[in-house]
């Protein structure tokens, strides 16, 4: 009996060992399977990351994260600055600068200030009415050309007077006909008149322009029209031609006897 019990115990021990030995193997197998699965998951995650980088989705997600973070920071900044009331004023200033109303208001303010200062200057000690009227008259005369016409008329009248005085006082009595035929007499007369007119104009500028009343002769509009048409210069030329013709006839009459004496002597 003892041997039988001993044999049964040995068999039970063997059976127990056979049942207990596969258990560790299954645990190891399960662990290896889990490790393999984890490695496979890690590999798949890495493949997904690589794929996301290649497709740009990872960068997009990162950009979205940064945008959301900036939005949160901006909202927080708005909440902080809104309490102080500076946001509304700054936005209003920015809108005014963008629309140009700020610059317009500054310009309007400067214009109003300049107008006020100008009015104060006129009230306190501005230029007198006589100075303003004289300046306006001078500007109008320069713009219309009457000032230049007066200078031209003065020079022409002065030249005519000097030419008449020269003919009366200093007319040469022994002049050859050849000078009139060659034109040298006319050239000398022109040079003399130009020199005399230049001298008189310089003296007129130094001493001061004489005052003349044009209402007795012609109106300003008529004088401008005559200068523009050239009729005034034509009248002066006619007067000079008539005077020259008269003087030439007198010269011919006075020198006729002298020429006859010369011919008889020859």
UniProtKB/Swiss-Prot annotation:
Gene3D superfamilies with a match to the protein in the record: 6.10.250.590
GO biological process, one term: positive regulation of insulin secretion involved in cellular response to glucose stimulus
Keyword Secreted: yes
Keywords: Cleavage on pair of basic residues, Hormone, Secreted, Signal
Cellular localization per UniProt: Secreted
Record SMART domains: GLUCA
GO molecular function ontology, one term from the record: glucagon receptor binding
Signal peptide: 1-20
Origin superkingdom: Eukaryota
Keyword Signal attributed: yes
Stretches with biased composition (Polar residues): 23-32
Propeptide: 21-50, 84-95, 136-140, 175-178, 213-224, 261-266
Region (Disordered): 23-44
GO CC annotations, alphabetized: extracellular space
Protein family (similarity comment): Belongs to the glucagon family.
Biological role: Promotes hydrolysis of glycogen and lipids, and raises the blood sugar level.
Protein name: Glucagon-1
Species lineage: Eukaryota, Metazoa, Chordata, Craniata, Vertebrata
């Amino acid at each position: 009996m003892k041997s039988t019990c001993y044999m049964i115990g040995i068999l039970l021990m063997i059976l127990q060992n056979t049942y207990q030995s596969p258990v560790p193997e299954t645990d190891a197998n399960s662990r290896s399977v889990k490790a393999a699965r984890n490695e496979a998951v890690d590999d798949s995650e890495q493949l997904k990351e690589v794929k996301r980088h290649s497709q740009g989705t990872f960068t997009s997600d990162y950009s979205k994260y940064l945008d959301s973070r900036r939005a949160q920071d901006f909202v927080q900044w708005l909440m902080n600055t809104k309490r102080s009331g500076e946001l509304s004023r700054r936005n209003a200033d920015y809108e005014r600068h963008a629309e140009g109303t700020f610059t317009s208001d500054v310009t309007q303010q400067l214009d109003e200030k300049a107008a006020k200062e100008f009015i104060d200057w006129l009230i306190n000690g501005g230029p007198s009415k006589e100075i303003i009227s004289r300046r306006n008259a001078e500007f109008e005369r320069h713009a219309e050309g009457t000032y230049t016409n007066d200078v031209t008329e003065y020079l022409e009248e002065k030249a005519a007077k000097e030419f008449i005085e020269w003919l009366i006082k200093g007319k040469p009595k022994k002049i050859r006909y050849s000078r009139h035929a060659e034109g040298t007499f006319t050239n000398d007369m022109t040079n003399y008149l130009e020199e005399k007119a230049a001298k008189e104009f310089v003296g007129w500028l130094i001493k001061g322009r004489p005052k003349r009343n044009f209402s007795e002769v012609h109106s300003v509009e008529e004088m401008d029209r005559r200068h523009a048409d050239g009729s005034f210069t034509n009248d002066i030329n006619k007067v000079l031609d008539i005077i020259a013709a008269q003087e030439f006839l007198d010269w011919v009459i006075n020198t006729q006897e002298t020429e006859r004496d010369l011919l008889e002597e020859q």
